UniProtKB/Swiss-Prot annotation:
One of its GO terms (molecular function) is structural constituent of ribosome. GO terms for cellular component: ribonucleoprotein complex; ribosome. HAMAP family: Ribosomal_uL4_B. It comes from Ligilactobacillus salivarius (strain UCC118). Part of the 50S ribosomal subunit. Residues 60-71 have a biased composition (Basic residues). This is Large ribosomal subunit protein uL4. One of the primary rRNA binding proteins, this protein initially binds near the 5'-end of the 23S rRNA. It is important during the early stages of 50S assembly. It makes multiple contacts with different domains of the 23S rRNA in the assembled 50S subunit and ribosome. Forms part of the polypeptide exit tunnel. Belongs to the universal ribosomal protein uL4 family. Keywords: Ribonucleoprotein, Ribosomal protein, RNA-binding, rRNA-binding. Residues 49-78 are annotated as: Disordered. InterPro entries: Ribosomal_uL4, Ribosomal_uL4-like, Ribosomal_uL4_dom_sf. One of its GO terms (biological process) is translation. The keyword Manganese does not apply.
Length: 207
């Protein structure tokens, strides 16, 4: 069973914490992680691209000239696709790019990236992150005490709004609740700082 040090806010070690091996001690599956990242990035696409087809372009309701007798090619509308200013054929329309992987696959992906963080010694567990007021300076001091000076993902308990407000203005710091833990945020940050309460919530969901 994986074991990591448990720290206090002042940076001093406060014992150790045992991690669930089924979540933090598996062999990472890179293929599944890749699929999960592609899924998340697809859901971030706006999908608002659009063109005007011949029914949406302004004008063109009148036949430009009679069908026969002019010597010219027959035309039904000046907004047909072959005309300058005409509608576009088979152009992009607004759509949603989001899709879902099976739940087991999504869970295997998050377990894989968490296990990789433990293997890389990039997981920092803190007993709690409690602040009297949402002060950015106070949160920055905590990160300094924990010797975290790179891009970091901070995972908090779902109801710890004070700490979330204190950290939201810090550069290279991403704060999410335990229920929002996802593959893309974990791999986009060098360090993962998680409170003991949030760790329990994550293990409860993924176990």
């Amino acid at each position: 069973m994986p074991t990591v040090a448990l720290f206090k806010q002042d940076g001093n070690q406060n014992g150790e914490v045992q991690l669930n091996e089924a979540i933090f001690g598996i062999e990472p599956n890179n293929n599944v992680v890749f699929d999960a990242v592609i899924m998340q990035r697809a859901s971030l696409r706006q999908g608002t691209h659009a063109v005007k087809n011949r029914s949406a372009v302004r004008g063109g309701g009148k036949k430009p000239w009679r069908q026969k007798g002019t010597g010219r090619a027959r035309q039904g509308s000046i907004r047909s696709p072959q005309w300058v200013g005409g509608g576009t054929v088979f152009g992009p329309t607004p759509r949603s790019y989001s899709y879902k992987l099976p739940r087991k696959v999504r869970r295997l992906a998050i377990k894989s990236v968490l296990s990789q963080k433990v293997a890389d010694e990039s997981l920092v567990v803190v007993d709690a992150l409690n602040f009297d007021a949402p002060k950015t300076k106070a949160f920055a001091e905590v990160l300094s005490n924990l010797n975290v000076n790179s891009k970091v993902l901070v995972v908090l308990e779902d109801d710890n709004t004070t700490a979330a407000l204190a950290a939201r203005n810090l550069k290279n710091v991403t704060v999410i609740p335990a229920k929002g833990l996802n593959v893309l945020d974990v791999i986009n940050n060098d360090k993962l700082v998680i409170t003991q309460g949030a760790l329990s919530q994550v293990e409860e969901v993924l176990a």
